Amino acid sequence: GEPFLHPLLPQFITIAHQKGFIPILTTNGTLLDNAQSVIDAHPHKVQISLQAHEGNTKENPEEYIREVMHFAKEAARQGIIIVLRLWNEGGEHNSMNPELLKLMAQHVPTPWTERPDGWKLSELIYLETDTTFEWPDTERAPYEQNEAFCHALRNQIGVLVDGTVVPCCLDSQ
């Protein structure tokens, strides 16, 4: 689920810190306009999946990127790592990538420092690109039992939208 929907998210981040965890959030970035309380709770990293824009109802890319970049710059000022993700290379939903990059450059001027997985836009703000991510599905062929292995529980947990804690975000069923 979208973590920014949960009204207790800042408290969850605080509790995670108290228990010795390193809170990392992944969001589609559509609810960042009122996220100061999340910044104040100071997660270690926030990953924003920009490719989600084409699949969501937010029709105005300028407003979307303005909100994302405002959040990113404010969070980075407070020492939070921001990873903007475009994981849709080679997919059918990437026609807006050039426009999104152009809009980002209005907020964080180029040239950006190239990295193996994308670019460093500014201090603590990164843009990562990758191929389209497909969730593993045991119902989809071809699938072999030994093919799917999740390393998540070794260094992370998932929290589902209903608050259920799972070893891996794929454990929703």
PLM regions with names:
Residues 2-116:
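Radical SAM/AdoMet-radical enzyme domain recognition
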